[in-house]
Amino acid sequence: MSAIVDIIGREVIDSRGNPTVECDVLLESGVMGRAAVPSGASTGSREAIELRDGDKSRYFGKGVLKACEHINTEISEAIMGLDANEQAFLDRTLIDLDGTENKARLGANATLAVSMAVAKAAAEESGLPLYRYFGGSGAMQMPVPMMNVINGGAHANNNLDLQEFMIIPVGAPSFREAIRYGAEVFHTLKKIINDKGLPTSVGDEGGFAPSVENHEAAIKLILQAIEQAGYEPGTQIALGLDCAASEFYKDGKYHLAGEGMTLSSADFTNLLGTWCDKYPIISIEDGMAENDWDGWATLTNALGKKVQLVGDDLFVTNTKILREGIQKNIANSILIKINQIGTLTETFAAIEMAKRAGYTAVISHRSGETEDSTIADIAVGTNSLQIKTGSMSRSDRMAKYNQLLRIEEDLGDIASYPGRGAFYNLK
């Protein structure tokens, strides 16, 4: 009864108004799984390939009809009749069918949509919530959210070079309370920004995008909001940064245009270290460019015992690259983005490899999202302990937070919120 009997790929629209791929998988029992894939703005050069049509007469070339056609033809032919419960076999079939290192032929947006839809159909037929289908009886840890409240870089049109300034409710007693902490700080920050006569419009991920004096001014705004909301910085709510440093790395230097600085890897490490000494920053993502492995080594040696150093563009959810990073003692955490690799099986392998090495795994959205909330179930199902899924606005972000609230309710008394314990990679 778990046999796949129909597969439909279609073009839908993401949170930025761009096309993306959605897939329906129908099983013999009549059960259906549906999944839609996200899309990034700042992307690592080694990510799996997102197949776009390139037809400038439709959506300025961003259409995904080719990817949908792949689903409706050769992918459908390859997996029709297979057992939806055999996720690893199905994903291997997709990988082999594509035949490239980076899913350039079929498109990672096509393979991922199918992979996710199959899992959701199998979970539905099993009568299990998706997180339980992924993780079994051991899935009971809620993730600590990293909430992007000020946007810069590729996610905003302001003078901030760093891409994300996040609040992390490490002192909350539960996920539900962590959401309350975040929402109250978000609304307080909105009032502070408004009172300064600055715009309170939000960026792609729901955070504010004010033009302020410099990066430290943005950090101080957030600290002010935390305190005015009645919380203690560092103890109850810590800070995180996503530098997205590849975006401003040119000719071997880091060009912070908003600061009027051009820095070497060592100098940028020193700047980040100074901020970590002055402010309660416990996580820095992509603190060096993806190809600056010497810079990553410098950063890890300097800060790796006291700050979570997350590789996003660095590792692109790829076990081959992660393995090399672990061997070279680069970073101490990996960001997990399902569309960077293109199947659930490969995603779970990256999470498991990170955990075995003592690295943390942070489940993440993309800047272009949909109402699909699968990453919430992945976070709990894999006991990944941390999630990045935007600010406290935009329904495409709230879809994930609301799913996590439902999961915590479903778990009841066995639900656990790790707080600062989610950062087990810090000494």
UniProtKB/Swiss-Prot annotation:
Its cofactor is Mg(2+). It catalyses: (2R)-2-phosphoglycerate = phosphoenolpyruvate + H2O. Pathway: Carbohydrate degradation; glycolysis; pyruvate from D-glyceraldehyde 3-phosphate: step 4/5. GO terms for biological process: glycolytic process. SUPFAM superfamilies: Enolase C-terminal domain-like (SSF51604), Enolase N-terminal domain-like (SSF54826). It is found in: Cytoplasm; Secreted; Cell surface. It comes from the Bacteria. The active site is at 205 (proton donor), 337 (proton acceptor). The keyword Metal-binding applies. GO terms for cellular component: cell surface; extracellular region; phosphopyruvate hydratase complex. Keywords: Cytoplasm, Glycolysis, Lyase, Magnesium, Metal-binding, Secreted. GO terms for molecular function: magnesium ion binding; phosphopyruvate hydratase activity. Its EC number is 4.2.1.11. Mg(2+) binds at residues 242, 285, 312. It is an enzyme of class 4 (lyase). It holds the Pfam family Enolase_C. (2R)-2-phosphoglycerate binds at residues 163, 337, 366-367, 388. Binds a second Mg(2+) ion via substrate during catalysis. InterPro entries: Enolase, Enolase-like_C_sf, Enolase-like_N, Enolase_C, Enolase_CS, Enolase_N. Belongs to the enolase family. HAMAP family: Enolase (MF_00318). Catalyzes the reversible conversion of 2-phosphoglycerate (2-PG) into phosphoenolpyruvate (PEP). It is essential for the degradation of carbohydrates via glycolysis. This is Enolase. It comes from Janthinobacterium sp. (strain Marseille).
